[in-house]
A protein has these predicted regions:
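Flexible, low-complexity segments enriched for small/polar residues
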Residues: 1-35, 44-276
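Helix N-cap / loop-to-helix initiation motif
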Residues: 38-39
Length: 276
């Protein structure tokens, strides 16, 4: 029963009432015992149940730092070609080669994920080093549970992570060459995979549907669209996208990408993005 409850609390909801105990936990415990303690079979029973897909369970828990950070990184589908050297004190228009550690596949992965491990730590989840053998309190400590993930410090750190998308994601500081390595999100490539990518309203809806599980109101969607458009007419965005697809130069791609930087930061900081 203990393991079945823990699985339920992790995948569905931290609080278990008497009805859930009888209808869900007991069958899970029976399956776990009868399957010779096979966790996969027990999880299948839970994840395929009608209860798991009950809409009352949607958006009922706060995302952990792992879900918040890596959920965004997965959607934006980071690519190595978008690493670049950023000179701290000057820009002369030249391109600079990345340090070897960022071109070697093994070391590249280390330095890339090292930055995001630091982000997790700032948000209250020191990945690989839980505070006790019980793990992190949000997964077991009644009655607060997942609310532990949010406080003034961790919320500020989440906002800092989201703000990286506005100014490019800092990856590594190269003190010797007075420069740093950053990652630039290739929004143009993401949008190309959308349905009807030349329509700004369709694009905004697809960003929202991919990143949020909460349905936004029309006023919120209008505000997000306005962040992208600024003072320009929606038809100009269509022209901008078509110009990029017809002639995908760096300048055309960059002009399209710039429209989505501030938008992404706002989208990731919405309160609706902190629940699932």
């Amino acid at each position: 029963y203990f393991i079945s409850r823990r699985l339920y609390q992790f995948f569905v909801y931290p609080e278990i009432d008497a009805i859930t105990e009888e209808k869900i936990i007991e069958p899970m415990a029976t399956k776990f015992r009868d399957s010779n303690f096979d966790l996969i079979e027990t999880l299948k029973l839970l994840l395929k149940s009608e209860h798991f897909f009950d809409s009352s369970n949607f958006n009922s828990m706060i995302k952990s730092p792992l879900e918040y950070v890596y959920g965004a990184l997965k959607f934006f589908n980071l690519h190595q070609e978008d690493f670049y050297m950023n000179l701290l004190n000057y820009k002369d228009g030249n391109s600079y080669e990345l340090p070897e550690k960022f071109t070697n596949p093994l070391s590249r992965e280390f330095y890339f994920y090292q930055k995001f491990i630091w982000d997790l730590e700032q948000q209250g989840c020191n990945f690989g080093d839980p505070p006790s053998v019980s793990g992190w309190p949000p997964y077991y400590q009644a009655p607060v549970y997942d609310l532990f993930w949010i406080n003034s410090k961790t919320l500020s750190s989440r906002a800092g992570f989201a703000n990286n998308f506005q100014w490019d994601l800092f990856i590594y500081n190269d003190w010797e060459n007075d420069s740093d390595v950053k990652y630039r999100v290739n929004y143009a490539k993401i949008i190309e995979g959308f349905d009807n990518p030349s329509d700004i309203y369709s694009v905004v809806n697809q960003f929202v549907n991919n990143l949020l599980t909460v349905e936004l109101g029309q006023e919120q969607l209008n505000d997000l669209t306005e962040i992208i458009l600024g003072s320009i007419d929606p038809t100009y965005y269509t022209e901008l996208y078509n110009r990029y697809t017809e002639n995908p130069t760096f300048e055309n791609k960059n002009e399209l990408n710039e429209r989505f930087r501030n938008f992404t930061t706002h989208l990731l900081t919405l309160s609706e993005n902190h629940v699932f």
